[in-house]
């Protein structure tokens, strides 16, 4: 597993990928308020390249609907090809059904900031083991 790669400010680094600008901004702000260093982008073919350019403790991929499962899976696979040891988690609502081997974690957050932070903390804790 990838070692913890805290930023120069001592905070854990998260790379967040979302398909909706407003959700991306809200989740980024919640994570920053809880002490994480966050860089984010909208879904794009360059997301895996961005992950490879810098060490991240966790990559979060938003999966807002069943429609997004395949693109999230493909992005996860791309990231793991470029950075095999990268810890990846999908952030989903409770209606999204995911059966996949790629993400290391599935965080069920709905629109609950506490569940998001708790899921990220748990995923990062498993990453350090």
Regions of interest found by a model, annotated:
Residues 74, 90-109, 113-114, 118:
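Alpha4 helix (beta4-alpha4-beta5 surface) of REC/receiver domains from two-component response regulators
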Residues 20-23, 64-68, 95-96, 113:
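Short acidic, S/G/P-rich loop/turn micro-motifs used as interaction or catalytic elements
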